[in-house]
Amino acid sequence: MIVVPVKEGENIERALKRFKRKFEKTGAVRELRARQAFEKPSVAKRKKMQKAIYMKQLQVAEE
């Protein structure tokens, strides 16, 4: 369970933003979407490799 303590005098929107950020980092929504339909291991591996290549290209272009 995610706990976000609200500091004294802190805006509720700021606390909500911190909660959303923590929730996003847990990856719960991403995992739920991935589990909606079965993905073959070969397809998952291919996607992972394509993402790695893409990220590498971005990194090289940045330099």
Swiss-Prot record:
It comes from Porphyromonas gingivalis (strain ATCC 33277 / DSM 20709 / CIP 103683 / JCM 12257 / NCTC 11834 / 2561). Pfam families: Ribosomal_S21. GO terms for biological process: translation. Belongs to the bacterial ribosomal protein bS21 family. This is Small ribosomal subunit protein bS21. InterPro entries: Ribosomal_bS21, Ribosomal_bS21_CS, Ribosomal_bS21_sf. It comes from the Bacteria. GO terms for molecular function: structural constituent of ribosome. Keywords: Ribonucleoprotein, Ribosomal protein. GO terms for cellular component: ribonucleoprotein complex; ribosome.
